[in-house]
Amino acid sequence: MAEIKILTEKIDKRELKRLVEQCFKDMVKYVVDIRQKRIAIGGELHADAEQLLLESGSEQKDIWGANYYPGKGESGCIEYTALINIRPSSGNSSMEVIDNNLQEKIREITFELIGKGEGL
């Protein structure tokens, strides 16, 4: 099983590169806890990272999945899409995070803990 790490501070660039290369080569899946402002990054499935956050104290309503693409700059590095985001009861009926305010929270935490789309 591919490694998943919980981030509470900025990830080292070498570590990010290793996580990107372990599964998809050009991107890494991650899950953000918007309340605790932490990220579970790595692995093959968003659901695995989601489970890790849930087991360590996160609440389902605060967890959203995304993909990070290094080297695509601030405007292109985040894809707000994951199966775990399908939550009709929370007003999100698609894989993509629809709410702009929620996207902004994810973006802020991503820029703080992962990066702003810089190359590796």
Specify the residue positions occupied by each region the protein language model found.
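Amphipathic, interaction-prone secondary-structure segments
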Residues: 44-75
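Negatively charged, low-complexity tracts enriched in Asp/Glu with abundant Ser/Thr
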Residues: 10-52
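Eukaryotic low-complexity, non-globular regulatory regions
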Residues: 1-3
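Well-ordered alpha/beta subsegment
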Residues: 96-120
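Intrinsically disordered, low-complexity regulatory segments enriched in Ser/Thr/Pro
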Residues: 70, 74-97
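Generic structural "secondary-structure junction" signal
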Residues: 8, 55-56, 65, 80, ...
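Short histidine-centered catalytic/ligand-binding loop motif
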Residues: 12-20, 89-99
